[in-house]
């Protein structure tokens, strides 16, 4: 099933990641390294490299176990990305990385930090993207301005579901009792894929019904800039909430299913209830129900048309996908 577009299906086609340099990601942890402590912090720029592979090579270089290496998040492989790694080396001098050699990897900075960089401990990412072959038209400029003003669907995209949707397929088989999954990492990937699928379906349905920017009775609303949310129950004034939504003081959310999912809108409740096997699996695995904004606003969105195509620059908070924004701009041509 194709997910709905907030700004209608794009007219143009373009190539994404034709070259690594067409997709640049710069991590923002949201804090500075302390300069001292038990951890060696290494900032790298990697090109066409897997995050985990680079982390393993750094750990090998300094002679520690991969378990004592950390990073905030996995970055795209076919891209140029900058991110921090940390290496637990208490009581040891800071290594000299000038002799570290790995194709596609440059060491940008080495310092110390007082605690481990943990998965998920980042504020967001800066993106610079070239969409090759996109042409300047009135329609595309209007589309970009609409995305800047109204945002884009906060969908989970392909990387969340694995190659050819493998993680989702396995999650569904697991939920139906066809397979048993013992590997901890695989369990995590499959559960995340299942939750992401239900989230996407709820958001897509709201967009298809032209209700993705309207507060409904039962909606779960998130306060801007926080993870706190409240329900648009009978005590709440829907008109007042709609005004707050339009001022971007609050955000509409969709479910990340878990155990004890709170009732929401009729639309959401009906869609969630269609996935009983997944709900049972989530309860069995003690996954905590959560919420995620339906729409996302790209911060500092800028664009320029160049000879090769369309250049985009923007910032997204952690957990949102640049490819979800790109999907609203152009149809991506497969190489």
From Swiss-Prot:
Endpoints of the signal sequence: none
Domain TRUD: 151-307
Domain of life, per lineage: Bacteria
Function: Responsible for synthesis of pseudouridine from uracil-13 in transfer RNAs.
Entry's Gene Ontology BP terms: tRNA pseudouridine synthesis
Keyword tags: Isomerase, tRNA processing
Family affiliation: Belongs to the pseudouridine synthase TruD family.
GO function terms (MF aspect): RNA binding; tRNA pseudouridine(13) synthase activity
PROSITE patterns, A to Z: TRUD (PS50984), UPF0024 (PS01268)
Protein name: tRNA pseudouridine synthase D
Species of origin: Pasteurella multocida (strain Pm70)
Any one Gene Ontology cellular component term annotated for this protein: cytosol
UniProt-annotated catalytic positions: 76
Catalytic activity, reaction form: uridine(13) in tRNA = pseudouridine(13) in tRNA
The enzyme's E.C. designation: 5.4.99.27
Pfam families documented for this protein: TruD
Class of the enzyme per the UniProt entry, highest EC level: isomerase
